[in-house]
Amino acid sequence: MNALLSSFLDAMVEEYRREHCATVSQVMEKMIAFSDGNIHDIDHLIRVWTYAKTIGDLEGLDADTQYVLEVAAITHDIACPLCRRKYGNTNGKHQEEEGARMVRAFLSDCGMSTGQVNRVAYLVGHHHTFRGIDGIDYQILIEADYIANASENGYSRENVMNFMNKIMKTESGKNLVKAVFVL
């Protein structure tokens, strides 16, 4: 597809999204309210969203992929409150299982296409799974969540270097890790 046609299609998708879908800020507002004052969860989702948005922008994602990525970054830990109550922890597998279902209901009134909701649900349902990464949105979500978790939890330099060298694929994500952790 030539660059002019691609640019035109991106503009059409963006115009449709602005008219019919919740904005990223509206999803953020809804997710913050859903978090019910849990400052740790709110700070984490904002941090992951910021890294995901930055990496996506720097990697030059098309408008639809960027939108799906940002919504997934905001909602990726939607199941944490339920997992704390139901299982007594926020184990990644429980988050993935519960989150994929929960995010569909959460986004049901946001005007997103079925394809967008399905992709967000897939990303939320796999955000702790580092194998079988099937798209740039998935890769960036994994990278953004890792950077946030590593900074919040004080991961060792060795752990960060290992993740960067074995899991990270985007140059922008690698550059952020190097800057954040002074590598």
Region spans (language model):
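Short secondary-structure capping/junction motifs at helix and strand boundaries
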Residues: 111-118
